[in-house]
Amino acid sequence: MKAVIQRVSRASVMVGGDTVGEIGPGLAVLLGVAEGDTQADAEYLVSKIINLRIFADGEGKFNLSLKDLCRELLVVSQFTLIADTRKGRRPSFVEAAQPEEADRLYNLFIRLCRGEGVQAATGKFGAMMMLEIHNDGPVTIILDSRDRLNPRQ
């Protein structure tokens, strides 16, 4: 499971011209589910994202997390994060989870966030969406749940 997280001053997602999710200050999360991902991958990313200290304290240092500040999340599914571009010029998506499993894990991710007391707005799984993201910083971080299996030495 991969996530691109962006610290935002605000963000929204539209489907068919209608706003389906919006937040104020917090994090926009683009979430891609890969074949073989499990609940453990979702749990790892939820814990990492909501506790990642990427908000400035009074001295301007990254010492505060989304959870510390009671900020919001906007979670949008994005299977293209699982693209394999190693061969040729057309991305392959064969490593992305099947839609039913991806939808299940995407919704689990959202439930886990909400279970931690985090306000989480969402896009619509499988829909064509328009995102408006006001990146704050900018701060953009890429997380991969498989990294938990290979910690730094």
Swiss-Prot record:
Annotated GO CC locations: cytoplasm
GO molecular-function term, one example from the UniProt record: Ser(Gly)-tRNA(Ala) hydrolase activity
Pfam families: Tyr_Deacylase
Taxonomic lineage of the native organism: Bacteria, Bacillati, Chloroflexota, Dehalococcoidia, Dehalococcoidales
Enzymatic class: hydrolase
Localisation: Cytoplasm
Function: An aminoacyl-tRNA editing enzyme that deacylates mischarged D-aminoacyl-tRNAs. Also deacylates mischarged glycyl-tRNA(Ala), protecting cells against glycine mischarging by AlaRS. Acts via tRNA-based rather than protein-based catalysis; rejects L-amino acids rather than detecting D-amino acids in the active site. By recycling D-aminoacyl-tRNA to D-amino acids and free tRNA molecules, this enzyme counteracts the toxicity associated with the formation of D-aminoacyl-tRNA entities in vivo and helps enforce protein L-homochirality.
Protein name (record): D-aminoacyl-tRNA deacylase
UniProt record similarity statement: Belongs to the DTD family.
